[in-house]
Amino acid sequence: MEVPIAAMTFAHPANVMTLASRQPKSKRSHISPATTAHRNLQTRLAHHHHATPASLPMAICNTVDKVINRFIDLPEQRPTVDPRRVLSGNFAPVDELPPTSCHVIRGSIPSCLAGGVYIRNGPNPQHRLPQRTHHLFDGDGMLHSLLIPSASSTLLSEPVLCSRYVHTYKYLLERETGGPVLPNFFAGFHGVAGLARAVVMIARVLAGQINLNKGFGLANTSITLFADCLYALCESDLPYSMHINPANGEVTTLGRCDFGGDLSFRMTAHPKKDPVTMELFAFRYNVFQPFITYFWFDRAGSKVADVPILSLQKPSVMHDFAITERYAIFPESQLIVNPMDMVMRGSSLVGLDRTMVPRIGVLPRYAKDESDMRWFEVPRFNMLHTTNGWEEADGEEIVLVAPNILSIEHMLGNMELMRARVDMVRINLCTGDVSCTALSPESLEFGVIHQGYVGRKNRYGYFGVSGPLPKIKGIRKLDFDLVGSGDCTVGRRDFGLGCFAGEPFFVPDNIDGYGNEDSGYVVCYTHEEDTGESWFVVMDAKSPELDIVAEVQLPSRIPYGFHGIFVKQAELLAQQ
């Protein structure tokens, strides 16, 4: 039985909704027809933004929620989820920004970026200072999109920034009601208060205020391009299809996508697209068995049947995974979901199990079941994000490069205390031998590579330097061929005192995406905390100092967020 993590006990059949009147081109669409109820909701929101008067059941639920927040689970009693702390500085939300021109204040933007768009996703709660506990991961999704003008553009002469919320069902519902309705998953489910919030949520469902068929996720984590469609992702819901207007940079939510009814539950925020076959590989994790379900899509977007994985020991929080040409690789960490601990011990829904030994599971990439699944113990290896995986020795050895979270107990609390070390794990499939080698002495996370090498042996990775996490104070380029040297760093860029960035992204400088692996540019948003200004920065990936070749001053502050991508002009024009 599949159970949505954020709702704990509610079944979640997909019911896809189109959120914009724009219809796709003649290519196959992954978005099902709109429901009448959602069209009515969208119409109401188009005419007004003020809160809808509460019905009696809704008013009762709202009152109980306030009692929980003010007398049972006070934010000030749990500083790590106090919104006054969590949403301070550049973690504070910003307003939406319509397409707005920006100025290139340094250098010139490389031609390989012309006509393309850099998009970064991240949390941005629509209710500025929530009157309840709040974790950074609980904010509504907002895309910050920077469109670079093409050489032939007659409409744009400068880059254009646009910041828009992803119009999830949760976002629209809480925008209409004027306040929080669905509980925060990471901060809200804690002890007696968490149980009480679950009861209130059940009451809201029974009263018809919440329709779980329409989802409850945030779409605040990442964005991916697959089969000519852009998707905003979060592991608590289905993907949301997005559109970036290549003429003016406007960002539009098209709808919640179930891939023609084949994807009936949520999906990881970190699917892997094979750059050769163009297939997309993904999974979801769950509170009850099967804890992990694996699946993939062909290059046209058709989903293959689920592969339930029942050999997982406990409901481990599995945020990311990796693929090689022949295998899918799953990391089992010590971070687990345990509803009974919340109920019986008054702890959080997600916690640390120090008795567990982390494992890595290896499954044939096109497996129809888990009969050939193998698990390998990797002590003290707790992975949140993967960088890449590949095979060596004619497929007898698996290599995985990933930041190892050395203090994973802080991930859901004092994130600034987290330290991550980039490790290379080697698994010999014949002997069962496992080794783990550090690639740098620094605390590095948010690693990216040339996307043309996903699942295949590559040499270079670009990582954010903890500033502390989740802020990034610099970028490091690692050469994986130097493994065993103690420090594989071959390129470095520090942003300076008080200047921080988000996850970098590598953009190859050649049209087809191949050639010299590090021939291209590293891009990201940066923020100067003293002045409150934000920039888009382009760095030469080949230079030892990751020299800045272009800098764009942005008209709005970009809060610290999560993951992003760069979509080249041809891909942008081909999107559905």
From Swiss-Prot:
One BP annotation, GO: carotene catabolic process
Gene Ontology CC annotations of this record: chloroplast stroma
Subcellular location: Plastid, Chloroplast
Reaction(s) catalysed (UniProt annotation): a 9-cis-epoxycarotenoid + O2 = a 12'-apo-carotenal + 2-cis,4-trans-xanthoxin; 9-cis-violaxanthin + O2 = (3S,5R,6S)-5,6-epoxy-3-hydroxy-5,6-dihydro-12'-apo-beta-caroten-12'-al + 2-cis,4-trans-xanthoxin; 9'-cis-neoxanthin + O2 = (3S,5R,6R)-3,5-dihydroxy-6,7-didehydro-5,6-dihydro-12'-apo-beta-caroten-12'-al + 2-cis,4-trans-xanthoxin
EC identifiers of the protein: 1.13.11.51
Keywords assigned by UniProt, alphabetized: Abscisic acid biosynthesis, Chloroplast, Dioxygenase, Iron, Metal-binding, Oxidoreductase, Plastid, Stress response, Transit peptide
Subcellular location, principal: plastid
Highest taxon listed in the record's lineage: Eukaryota
Pfam families according to UniProt: RPE65 (PF03055)
Gene induction: Down-regulated by submergence. Induced by drought stress. Down-regulated by glucose.
Binding site for Fe cation: 270, 319, 385, 563
Presequence boundaries: 1-34
Details of cofactor binding: Binds 1 Fe(2+) ion per subunit.
Cofactor dependence: Fe(2+)
Family statement: Belongs to the carotenoid oxygenase family.
Task performed by this protein: Has a 11,12(11',12') 9-cis epoxycarotenoid cleavage activity. Catalyzes the first step of abscisic-acid biosynthesis from carotenoids.
Protein name listed in UniProt: 9-cis-epoxycarotenoid dioxygenase NCED2, chloroplastic
Species for this entry: Oryza sativa subsp. japonica
